[in-house]
Curated annotation (Swiss-Prot):
Domain of life, per lineage: Bacteria
Compositional bias per record (Basic and acidic residues), positions renumbered to this chain: 53-75
Keyword Transmembrane helix on entry: yes
Pfam families linked: TatA_B_E (PF02416)
Name of the gene encoding the protein in the UniProt record: tatA
Residue numbers spanned by region Disordered: 47-75
Lineage of the species this protein comes from: Bacteria, Pseudomonadati, Campylobacterota, Epsilonproteobacteria, Campylobacterales
GO biological process terms held by the UniProt record: protein transport by the Tat complex
Key words of the record: Cell inner membrane, Cell membrane, Membrane, Protein transport, Translocation, Transmembrane, Transmembrane helix, Transport
Family label: Belongs to the TatA/E family.
Gene Ontology molecular function terms on file: protein transmembrane transporter activity
Signal peptide: none
Described purpose of this protein according to its UniProt entry: Part of the twin-arginine translocation (Tat) system that transports large folded proteins containing a characteristic twin-arginine motif in their signal peptide across membranes. TatA could form the protein-conducting channel of the Tat system.
Organism: Sulfurovum sp. (strain NBC37-1)
Alphabetical list of Gene3D superfamilies matching this protein: 1.20.5.3310
Official protein name in the record: Sec-independent protein translocase protein TatA
Amino acid sequence: MGMPSMPELLIVLAIVVLLFGAKKIPDLAKGMGKGIKDFKKAIKEDDEEEEVKEITKKEEPKVEAAAEEKKSENA
C-alpha cells in the first residue's frame, strides 16, 4: 500500500470539490497556509526563547563571581 495513484488522487479531488465547492477551496488553502506559517513562527520563537535562557544561565555564575570579588575587595 504505497502512494496513491493518479486516478485515486483525482477521485479525492472531485470529492473535495463536491463537498466544499470550487469557490471555497482557495479560502481553505489560504487558511491552511496561514496556519502552517503561524505554527512555524511559534516554533522559531520558542527556540529563540530557549537560547536566551541558556545564555542567561551561562552568564549568571560570571556575574555572581564578579559581585563576590568586588564585595571582598571592599571589605
